[in-house]
Amino acid sequence: MMPIAEILRVYPGVGDSGFRALVDAFYRRVEADPLLRPIFPADLTQGRERQYLFLRQYFGGPAEYSERYGDPQLPRRHRPFPITREARDVWVTHMFAAIEEVGIPEPHASVMREYFERFSLAMINQSDEPSSPTFEPSRAHIPARLIDTINQ
């Protein structure tokens, strides 16, 4: 788990333009992905903006996401969307590729990759097995320190 101080140093090192470029690069991949595209709304404009505001805030930027939308509560906000382990893995692959494409510098890229790798697991809300029932993951597998940071 990354120390909070390292997480909060990402925004000053990446800046608004870096986060905007990251989200744009990520969403270009989502738009072209046959597994992920159907999970997202037809109009990606609002999702892009929310992701930009959330990432900027989480990594030490202005708290505009919380001011506009309240507590992120990401697992709850993603519950309506069918997210399997496979979809999560593809999502992470696209986010990592976007980090590389944009050229997020170290150590910020590593901090971001660790966050995406760990926290994306909490978004899984469906089994990859077609015959398995939908399950609701608990926050138990998410480190309490990360939950506290996200809820701030």
Language-model segments: what does each one mean?
Residues 1-152:
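Core of compact, soluble alpha-helical bundle domains
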